[in-house]
Regions:
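Iron-sulfur cluster-binding cysteine motifs and their immediate structural context
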Residues: 2-4, 13-42, 47-66, 300-305, ...
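Short, flexible, mixed-charge glycine/proline-rich loop motifs
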Residues: 2-5, 10-14, 45-46, 285, ...
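Iron-sulfur-associated redox domains of electron-transfer enzymes in respiratory
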Residues: 63-374, 378-383, 391-402
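HAMP domain helices
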Residues: 377-383, 403-406, 412-452, 456, ...
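Alpha-helical coiled-coil heptad-repeat segments
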Residues: 430, 437-446, 526, 530-600
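Parallel, heptad-repeat alpha-helical coiled-coil signal-transduction segments
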Residues: 458-476, 487-542, 549
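Intrinsically disordered, low-complexity terminal
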Residues: 599-607
Length: 607
C-alpha cells in the first residue's frame, strides 16, 4: 500500500508527541542516532490518520498527495474531470479556486454531495432489505484501514456501501459516462489509500496542498466563483460535519433507528476497540464514525484557518437552507429516482483483511521488558507518565520488547539513574570532606615534625660545638701528658708512677679524639638526613596544600552537580506531571445546534 505519511527525520528531536497521538501500536519506531532519540514511521502499520502531522511542532511529518502530478498532467492536456468534497463550502476562496481549475482545462466539476445522497439512499435500502444487527459506517479510509489491519472481527460490521466520494466517482464513470481521468478535491490524507484500493480515482488532490500551490506561485484567483456540472444535492451537503450521515438517516428513519456516533483523536479508535469487545446486544444499529473531531470540514488535508465555531455556523446556515428548500416529499422522490436509475450493486464494496507483522506477547516477555526499564516495584510498573509516548508502563515494556521503543526513552528510568548518580555524588562529597580533614590533620602533624626537626638540628649544632671543645681539650691534654712523660723520664725511678699516669692520660686523649671524630661524621650524616627529611616534608606539605585545594574545588563542583540534578529532577517531574495532565485532557468539545423546522414548497425533483 502506498506510503502517504512521510518524514524529514533530521528535524526529529524525539519529543514522542507523534507516538502519543497515534492510535496504532508499533506505527512509530524509536531509535538512537548519534545519541539523539529519533522516531520514524513504520509504513506497513500506519493507517494514515494524520494525527502525527498535526501534533508535530518540528515539521518532521508531512503527507504526499497527487497535486503536482494532477497539475502537470492538466498542463499537458490530459482530459481530467474532478469532483469536490462538501468541505469546500467552508473554505475561503474555495469556489474561486474551482473556477481557476476550469481555466486550467478541467472538463467537468461535480459536487460530491451527490455521492453523499447516493450513499444515504444505499444505506437506507440496505438497512430496509437486510435489517442488519450492527453497521459501522466507512466514510473515513483511516478507520477502514484500522479495521482491515487490526480489527478483523469487525470487518463483518463494516458498511458494504461505498463512501460518498467513491459513490460520486462510480456515478461519474457508470452513469454520467465520463471517460476522463478522475481527480478528487479532497480534505483527507488517507483518501489516497481508498482510491488506490478501489481504482476509480486517479488523483487525490488535497485542499491544503492545492491552496499552498496557488499561494506559493502567487496565483491570483478569479473573482467569479464556479458552479457544479450536476444537479443540486440535498442533505448530502451535511456529510462533511460530525454526524452528517446520522442526520441524513434520521431524516428518513426518525428516531426509530439507534445511531451512535464517535469522532476524533482520543475517542473514535478507543470506541472502535470497545465496540469489538462489547456485548452484541448493546451495539447500535448504526455506528457513525469519523477520524477527525470536526469531520471533513477540518480534515487532515484542510488548512485549519477557520474556527470550529465559524465552521458550525456555516453548516447550520446550510442545514437551514436545505430544510427550507427540500422536504420529505422531495426526499422520497429523490430516493425513488435512485431506485429507478441506479443499481445498488454498483455501490457495494467488499473488504479483504490486511496482514501485518505481529509478535505474540506473553507475561514473561512483559516482565523482561520491565527489567530492561529497571522497573521492579509495583509503583515503578504503574508510573504511567506517558512521556515515552505510551499510555502506560505496561505498553512501554511491550514496545521495548517488540523493538518499537527503547529503554532510554523512559523518563522514570532516567530519573532513577540520575538519582543514583546524585547519591554517589553526595557520598563522594562526604568522602572528600573526610579526606580534606585528614589532609589538614596530616599537615598539622607535618608542621609539628618540622618543629621537632628544627629543635634536633639546633641540638646537633650544639653537640658539634661541644665536640669541638672536647677535641680541643683532648689535644691540650695530650700535650700536657706528653710534657709529663718527658718530666717523668728526667726524674728517673721517682717519676715512674707519674709516667704511667701520663701515659693513661695520653691514651684517654687519643680515644677522645677518635670519639669526637666519629661524632663529627655521624653529625654530618644526621644533618644531611635531617635536611632531606625537612625538604621531603616541605614537598609533602606543598602536595597536601595542592590536594586540599583540588578537593575543595571538587567539593564545590559536586555540590553544583547535586544542585543541578535536583533542579533537573524537579523539571522532569513537572514534565511528567504535565504529560499526564495533557493526556487526560478531552480531545474536543462537541457542539450541537437545533434543526430548523421551517419548510418551504419544494421544487420538482429532476436529474
Amino acid at each position: 500500500m502506498r506510503k502517504i505519511i512521510n518524514e524529514d527525520i533530521a528535524k526529529c528531536v524525539g519529543c514522542n508527541r507523534c507516538i502519543r497521538v497515534c492510535p496504532v501500536e508499533g506505527a512509530n519506531h524509536v531509535y538512537k542516532d548519534n545519541d539523539v532519540i529519533k522516531v520514524s514511521i513504520e509504513p506497513e502499520r500506519c493507517i494514515a490518520c494524520g494525527f502525527c502531522i498535526d501534533t508535530c511542532r518540528h515539521k518532521v511529518r508531512f503527507y504526499e498527495d497527487d497535486t503536482e502530478q494532477f497539475l502537470s498532467d492538466l498542463r499537458r492536456g490530459e482530459p481530467i474531470s474532478l469532483f469536490v468534497a462538501p468541505a469546500i463550502q467552508v473554505i475561503e476562496g474555495g469556489m474561486q479556486m474551482l473556477m481557476w481549475l476550469r481555466k486550467q482545462g478541467v472538463k467537468k466539476i461535480i459536487d460530491a454531495s451527490i455521492g453523499a445522497d447516493i450513499c444515504t439512499w444505499a444505506h437506507i435500502r440496505y438497512i430496509e432489505k437486510n435489517n442488519p444487527h450492527a453497521v459501522i459506517t466507512q466514510p473515513c479510509p483511516a478507520i477502514v484501514n484500522y479495521i482491515l489491519k487490526y480489527k478483523h472481527s469487525l470487518i463483518r460490521y463494516l458498511s458494504p456501501v461505498h463512501s460518498p466520494m467513491l459513490c460520486t466517482a462510480i456515478w461519474m464513470k457508470r452513469y454520467d459516462r465520463n471517460t476522463d481521468a478522475i481527480a478528487a478535491i479532497s480534505p483527507c490524507v488517507a483518501k489516497a489509500h481508498e482510491f488506490e484500493q478501489t481504482g476509480y480515482v486517479k488523483y487525490n488532490v488535497t485542499i491544503k496542498n492545492l491552496m499552498h500551490y496557488i499561494r506559493d506561485n502567487d496565483i491570483e484567483l478569479p473573482e467569479q466563483a464556479s458552479g457544479f456540472d450536476n444537479r443540486e444535492a440535498a442533505f448530502g451537503r451535511l456529510y462533511s460535519m460530525p454526524g452528517g450521515l446520522k442526520e441524513n438517516l434520521e431524516f428518513y428513519f426518525g428516531k426509530n433507528l439507534r445511531i451512535d456516533q464517535a469522532e476524533g483523536q482520543g475517542v473514535v479508535y478507543e470506541s472502535i476497540d470497545a465496540y469489538a469487545e462489547e456485548n452484541p446486544a448493546m451495539l447500535p444499529t448504526v455506528f457513525d464514525v469519523l477520524n477527525c473531531g470536526e469531520g471533513c470540514n477540518l480534515g487532515t488535508a484542510v488548512e485549519h484557518n477557520i474556527s470550529r465555531f465559524a465552521t458550525h455556523s456555516m453548516m447550520d446556515d446550510s442545514r437551514k437552507q436545505i430544510l427550507k428548500t427540500f422536504d420529505r416529499d422531495y426526499y422520497n422522490r429523490m430516493l425513488a429516482h435512485f431506485d429507478q436509475r441506479l443499481n445498488m450493486n454498483d455501490f457495494i464494496r467488499k473488504y479483504l483483511p490486511m496482514a501485518t507483522k505481529s509478535m505474540a506477547v506473553t507475561e514473561d516477555l512483559i516482565e523482561e521488558g520491565y527489567q530492561r526499564l529497571h522497573k521492579s516495584t509495583e509503583i515503578q510498573k504503574t508510573f504511567d507518565c506517558a512521556a515515552c509516548g505510551c499510555d502506560t508502563c505496561y505498553e512501554m515494556a511491550k514496545a521495548v520488547m517488540l523493538g518499537d521503543n527503547i529503554p532510554e526513552n523512559c523518563i522514570q528510568m532516567l530519573h532513577d539513574e540520575i538519582t543514583d548518580v546524585l547519591n554517589i555524588a553526595v557520598s563522594n562529597i562526604s568522602t572528600a570532606t573526610l579526606l580534606e580533614n585528614d589532609i589538614s590533620e596530616i599537615q598539622e602533624q607535618s608542621g609539628t615534625i618540622s618543629e621537632f626537626i628544627i629543635t634536633l638540628t639546633e641540638g646537633i649544632t650544639k653537640f658539634e660545638t661541644i665536640s669541638k671543645s672536647i677535641l680541643s681539650i683532648a689535644t691540650h691534654t695530650n700535650l700536657v701528658a706528653l710534657n709529663a712523660s718527658i718530666e717523668a723520664a728526667r726524674a728517673g725511678i721517682h717519676g715512674k708512677a707519674f709516667a704511667v699516669v701520663a701515659e693513661e692520660v695520653q691514651s684517654l686523649a687519643a680515644k677522645s679524639k677518635e670519639v669526637v671524630s666519629e661524632s663529627e661524621e655521624i653529625s654530618k650524616k644526621s644533618q644531611k638526613a635531617i635536611t632531606a627529611v625537612n625538604d621531603l616534608l616541605t614537598n609533602i606539605s606543598g602536595s597536601y596544600e595542592k590536594a586540599n585545594i583540588s578537593i575543595s574545588v571538587l567539593n564545590q563542583s559536586l555540590s553544583k552537580i547535586v544542585d543541578s540534578i535536583d533542579i533537573d529532577l524537579d523539571a522532569k517531574k513537572k514534565i511528567a506531571d504535565t504529560t499526564v495532565s495533557q493526556a487526560q485532557l478531552p480531545e474536543s468539545v462537541t457542539l450541537a445546534s437545533d434543526d430548523s423546522d421551517d419548510y418551504d414548497k419544494v421544487p420538482e425533483y429532476t436529474h
